[in-house]
Amino acid sequence: MATTASSAANSASRFSIDSSISRSRHGDSSPWLLPSDSHDHPTLSLSQDDPFSAPSVSPPTGNNSSDYDNADKKPPPVWNMPSSNSSSDVGPVMGAAESWPALSLSARSSSIKSPSLDASKPFPDGSSSSIPPPQATSNTSTNANAGSSVSATSSENSAVNNSQRKPFRRNNNTSSSSTSSNVSNAAPLNTRDQNHSQRGGGSFGSGNFRNSQRNRNSSSYPRGEGLHHGNRRNYEHGNQSGFSHRNYSGRDMHLQPQRGVGMIRPQMLMGPPSFPASSAQYMAAPQLGSYGGPIIYPDYAQHVFMPHPSPDPMGLVGPFPLQPMYFRNFDAILYNKILTQVEYYFSADNLSRDEHLRDQMNDEGWVPVRVIAAFRRLAELTNNIQTILEALRSSEVVEIQGETLRRRGDWDKYLLPREPSRSGPAAGASNNASLVSQIESMTLSERSREGV
């Protein structure tokens, strides 16, 4: 740091001498000469040749204060004073950059082009700068005041940023020259902007340095390396499948393993409608389409489906609906009571005592159902003949024939004997006598009517 400070002091002294020589050529009279009335504030100096250069601020010292003790003596110009060695150690004072140039000088300086930096001047540490300093078009002399104003700050930052500025000679020569030309053609800047850049710790080339840094960062990856600028595979923008935009030509494809014929996935198709549970179920095998999916998207479903054969000629016909079964509304308890009561009527114990039921039997032992339904106990349960017949179908004692009932097995044991019919001449004579008497009575009645 001591070496850097010494170099900065020597440079400041050299620039101050050069500025004195330059002023001797143009004269000492300048509207920028400001008499110093106070010893407490720093002195602001601007160059007449270069109104755009940063002002040089020098702090008050003990030697300078002795020069102004004599009030009768005219104070010397501000920039005729040699720069002190302490100027390299003391930074700019707040508020010193708020001075504005006179309107007449501002109007005259608008026609002067901005100088460019001299690329041949070395930095205090011996390294050459890649940014050319501004040069005046009408005068070949360098801007001494600009160098002296920024030497203190640039000497400290040049050693740190030297390694960062060297790459610009290789990559950004064009951008540096274009930046210099743009600066020379731009409108004149005021001292506020220049001092603002000086406060930030940078010189006139700090803005170019930042711009070139962005340019270098944007082009830090050469073509053919890193991210594949022109034909890079867009892996980081949602294209995680591994297929680049160049796959339409059929090159550089990363296809998945084949899963079937034609590089497509087997598609499960719905089989025919299901049949009733009694018949065997038919399961259709997975069918493969005749056309595969697109090569670019192997997982994309196929568009053409081949129909599969039906299991039988009626394969596309749905199952017939089952007819609902008709269940008669019956009461199991009622049927059980009817069955028990009728079986009691035709039991052996009841038939041996019940001559009325036996008298209703025909020669084959059949008894009409309406006779049984007329019984008091059965009539209390139901008077419906069909209900009685339905309840007796599961009986093991009574058998049914139409609407007649009889006992199973030994029904002939319970038949009553029949009385023989009356026959002979006596019977015939009596019948004839009765017939003759009837005829005679009729004849007599007719005669009596005629006589009257």
From Swiss-Prot:
- Bias regions of kind Basic and acidic residues — which residues? 225-236
Name this protein carries in UniProt: La-related protein 1B
- Comp. bias (Low complexity): 1-22, 99-117, 136-163, 171-185, 206-223, 422-434
Q: Which family does it belong to?
A: Belongs to the LARP family.
What are the residue boundaries of the HTH La-type RNA-binding domain, all occurrences included?
A: 328-417
Q: What is the lineage of its organism?
A: Eukaryota, Viridiplantae, Streptophyta, Embryophyta, Tracheophyta
Give the chief site where it resides: cytoplasm
**Which residues does the annotated region (Disordered) include?**
1-251, 419-452
Gene that this sequence comes from = LARP1B
Q: Where is the signal peptide?
A: none
Q: Which residues carry this modification: N-acetylalanine?
A: 2
Organism of this sequence: Arabidopsis thaliana (Mouse-ear cress)
